[in-house]
């Protein structure tokens, strides 16, 4: 059991003097779980972390999803080391980027052409530009609660109604940009239709997380994605899948392969980099030919397609091609789900658990979670207490009630068994303090 965070606390105090908020991404702070110093990690191996105080954790954060093969996987580490020895940045075409592009196309047939960038935010941002160039329209639709990166183009919240033009969700985002975004509830065909009836003639594209990962793991209702394609295409707009979280996480070919629905454009990131910074986007040939140097939609990047990220990504996909890997993730996920639900019943703790294969979210509520409104209406204070109890048990989770638990290929049944026991102790403590 973890008992001290002395060095993490000291390091955070020092970080506050030099780094904004002491963190380089706000999701890493503990603000959403009651505050305190975030735990600083020193090294990772397989399914485990060790912090600066020497405490060991079973990791279910997985860097918010990318580390599907576990930390410091030897095949990926070797590829990165070799790339570093050969020079990590050229500013020229390489054989590695061609090989990796071919691998992505083979995995995801909807990608006639691809282009590499440096992050999921960049990938989404550019698909929007390409969609606007192709359609000649300006408005974008998205689903409430679905995060598509921190660019001005999509950092908006829903208004008071389902088809209301967006309002900025961050200082510094001009109202003029936010007004180009229309937000509708996920899993609701009727409100989508209403919005398209009103704004469809101005809409360039709709951004879709085919399986939601940013207000927990939420699957689309049967037939929902098919209806999205139908309605959006009828309006003359494009369908963009944001598979930054989902690609290669639930199935090798991404959510579009798992669900059997094809988008016009796809944004990728996270898993495809094997832990290094990366993004990619692609889609139908006639749409992608809008991108410079072939077309008028400009996109460039000094670091785009750098050899280190290409080598890491290739190695990661090679690992993910191993037979039985996704079946193992599903099996461990089912085992963890069953154990958590049993512990909740045993200790009379109200939870709803959403799981798809090797990813799940525990919500402190009895309500079904199918959209963002339902996810918001869950007990964040209870989650914060649970999070810190699990940290004391040596279990590393994301510090937010909206985030998923991600399994890796390196988790074992013994890890799951210990985690279930730890959940039981945490639930017992919560029950005693009700």
Swiss-Prot record:
Keyword Cytoplasm: yes
Localization annotation: Cytoplasm
Catalytic reactions of this protein: (S)-4-amino-5-oxopentanoate = 5-aminolevulinate
Annotated metabolic or biological route of this protein: Porphyrin-containing compound metabolism; protoporphyrin-IX biosynthesis; 5-aminolevulinate from L-glutamyl-tRNA(Glu): step 2/2
A single cellular component GO annotation: cytoplasm
One record GO biological process: protoporphyrinogen IX biosynthetic process
EC number: 5.4.3.8
Domain of life, per lineage: Bacteria
UniProt-listed Pfam families: Aminotran_3
Gene3D superfamilies linked: Aspartate Aminotransferase, domain 1, Type I PLP-dependent aspartate aminotransferase-like (Major domain)
Keyword annotations from UniProtKB, A to Z: Cytoplasm, Isomerase, Porphyrin biosynthesis, Pyridoxal phosphate
Co-factor requirement: pyridoxal 5'-phosphate
UniProt GO molecular function: glutamate-1-semialdehyde 2,1-aminomutase activity; pyridoxal phosphate binding; transaminase activity
CDD domains recorded: OAT_like (cd00610)
Main location: cytoplasm
Assembly behavior: Homodimer.
Family classification: Belongs to the class-III pyridoxal-phosphate-dependent aminotransferase family. HemL subfamily.
Protein's recorded name: Glutamate-1-semialdehyde 2,1-aminomutase 1
